[in-house]
Amino acid sequence: MLYWLIDFASTIPAFNVFRYITFRTGGAMVTGALFVFLCGPWIIDNLRLRQGKGQPIRSDGPQSHLSKKGTPTMGGLMVLSGLVVGTVLWANPLNPYVWIVLAVTLGFGFVGFYDDYLKVTKQSSQNGFAGRWRLLIEAVIAAAACYALVRLGRDPLSSSLVIPFFKDVAINLGWFFVGFGAFIVVGAGNAVNLTDGLDGLAIVPVMIAAASFGLISYLAGNAVFADYLQINYVAGTGELSVLCGALLGAGLGFLWFNAPPASIFMGDTGSLALGGMLGSIAVAVKHEIVLAVIGGLFVLEAVSVIVQVASFKLTGKRVFKMAPIHHHFEQKGWTEPQIVIRFWIIAVMLALAGLSTLKLR
């Protein structure tokens, strides 16, 4: 909404600052953080009151997790609220990319919320939303968003898979891109969901990825920078930096309450939504493959589960002591802070590697 203050810039020159994406990104970040800082305690108290026993803890999981019993979940509501407030206040409301990504984020958030609701009411981590139905709804949301992105672009690039490291190399998938894009979005959502198993483990890598894609969005949406870096220019996607800024701020606010020992868990409400958001931004700015690098930690967590399940079904043996892989290291004797901080370091290194692809052509 503040974007419209530009209309009064001729009378009040100071309002010209609202033309700049960088200024509005910073504003969205501060707004998201302040909202969560101020409203967080109230949200946590209400969730604790309504949930009673809080998030159910797996009896077959690491014994150290039993001390977390009674901690409320659905903390993603805090992040999503800060994200929406920051975005609505600071983003250009006429930019379609903003609303497409926001629709995916909230759609995935609703699916995650329902899953959390079932787990809390049944007090069982195994009795959430049926997997096949959850994936189906996620796929429909993601496919609709990717279809909208292709229609919005109206050029071969919008339905093409761009290959990093090479100049002007893109594979036009036609309408098959809708399915490919949906796979990326759904995969990202569930990969982040699998990562969210320890206090602070998921939110910081999500913020690192959001900061990275905020930069990529800004560069891809700027014709001058895109030409200089020889990346594909996608008009209008620069505005997605504002969403990334809002997520970064809301994430910082959430981390204040999610730091060990956590006062609240993000739950599927947050992890599915934020993963879906990252996936849809990557599709919008044509950096789907780069997402696999920047979000490599999420990929590692997802692959560890796939390998574990496949190995057990085929051979009857497990590759890891427990999956996802962060639980494997818990079983090996690593403390929770060791795992979390080391995974943060990996996330930073992968983000730098992913961003380096912008210049390596």
UniProtKB/Swiss-Prot annotation:
Highest taxon of source: Bacteria
InterPro entries registered for this protein in UniProt: Glycosyl_transferase_4, PNAcMuramoyl-5peptid_Trfase, PNAcMuramoyl-5peptid_Trfase_CS
Subcellular location: Cell inner membrane
Protein name: Phospho-N-acetylmuramoyl-pentapeptide-transferase
Similarity comment: Belongs to the glycosyltransferase 4 family. MraY subfamily.
Cofactor: Mg(2+)
EC number: 2.7.8.13
Catalysis: reaction(s): UDP-N-acetyl-alpha-D-muramoyl-L-alanyl-gamma-D-glutamyl-meso-2,6-diaminopimeloyl-D-alanyl-D-alanine + di-trans,octa-cis-undecaprenyl phosphate = di-trans,octa-cis-undecaprenyl diphospho-N-acetyl-alpha-D-muramoyl-L-alanyl-D-glutamyl-meso-2,6-diaminopimeloyl-D-alanyl-D-alanine + UMP
A biological-process GO annotation: regulation of cell shape
Keywords (A to Z) from UniProt: Cell cycle, Cell division, Cell inner membrane, Cell membrane, Cell shape, Cell wall biogenesis/degradation, Magnesium, Membrane, Metal-binding, Peptidoglycan synthesis, Transferase, Transmembrane, Transmembrane helix
Enzyme class: transferase
Stored PROSITE patterns: MRAY_1, MRAY_2
Species annotation: Rhodopseudomonas palustris (strain BisB18)
UniProt lineage: Bacteria, Pseudomonadati, Pseudomonadota, Alphaproteobacteria, Hyphomicrobiales
Annotated function: Catalyzes the initial step of the lipid cycle reactions in the biosynthesis of the cell wall peptidoglycan: transfers peptidoglycan precursor phospho-MurNAc-pentapeptide from UDP-MurNAc-pentapeptide onto the lipid carrier undecaprenyl phosphate, yielding undecaprenyl-pyrophosphoryl-MurNAc-pentapeptide, known as lipid I.
Topological relation to the membrane, as annotated: Multi-pass membrane protein
Main location: membrane
